[in-house]
Amino acid sequence: MALTAKVKDELARLPVTKTCCRKAEVAATLRFAGGLHLVGGRIVVEAELDTGAAARRLRTALAELYGQHAELAVIAPGGLHRGNRYVVRVSRDGETLAKQTGLLDGRGRPVRGLPSQIVSGGVCDAAAAWRGAFLAHGSLTEPGRGCTLEVSCPGPESALALVGAARRLGVQAKSREVRGVERVVVRDGDAIGVLLTRLGAHDSVLAWEEYRVRREVRATANRLANFDDANVRRSARAAVTAAAKVKRALEILGDSVPEHLAAAGTLRMVHPQVSLEELGALADPPLTKDAIAGRIRRLIAMADRRADELGIPGTEAALVGELP
């Protein structure tokens, strides 16, 4: 199950007993998932949700808190929606319900943000509002290049209200407009974990953290692999460079090169790709990494001094065209 579906399923089954919290959740769900419609001169309250569990939760809450019998309709997949959509609709006494849930104020005017009792309420009300908003239009991406928990909002006022509710929960959220839609976004991985915990999605938090850890382990392994590859490439380039310079050094020095330096240089030319440690092991008798490297350095330095005396190109001349 995708993370978004997992979170919504868990939140839709979360038992909540406090009336104020249940009302805050219902108000937010209606605000973010639906709206008001005028049908035959009557106000109809409607909410469209993407999970059956969330729709049934809303329908039950409307009956228990407000005594409203809501219709539940299922819309088959089509257009941009790959799965079923669930519409919860209250046609009878819709205006009364709209006022009770804060969709309309006392004078019957639309409320653009969240009801004042949520905005000025406690932490539990803020968490309930976020729970309703996420059930309505929330999404959670799996940790990857960027972690994102996002809620699409019906307008800037509701987005700002949701940002304020997040602040009361100790979470930094930002509001932004994307392709004409207001969205509230939480990007920090730790903040997402805190928010999910506040909403009551404890099992989902564990799954989220497991995804994060797995992603970080993979990223660390990739960094180490890239680091190792880079080291191998650097070592190989250095070995090829040394082999080319050694060949030129032996040409410059001819028979005057000391035997032990000539032996070290010959080993490097014969085995241009091996590491210094492996090269030392091939010597007779075996040499340490530092010892074989020192002999090769002295051979090249001796050849460069001799080239200066003779006025001819030194060992660097051997590198032209040798390396990419």
Swiss-Prot record:
This is Probable cell division protein WhiA. InterPro entries: Homing_endonucl, Sporu_reg_WhiA_N_dom, Sporulation_regulator_WhiA, Sporulation_regulator_WhiA_C, WhiA_LAGLIDADG_dom. Belongs to the WhiA family. Residues 275-308 bind DNA. The keyword Transcription regulation does not apply. It comes from the Bacteria. The gene is whiA. It comes from Acidothermus cellulolyticus (strain ATCC 43068 / DSM 8971 / 11B). The keyword Transport does not apply. It holds the Pfam family WhiA_N. GO terms for molecular function: DNA binding. Signal peptide: none annotated. Involved in cell division and chromosome segregation. GO terms for biological process: cell division; regulation of sporulation. Keywords: Cell cycle, Cell division, DNA-binding.
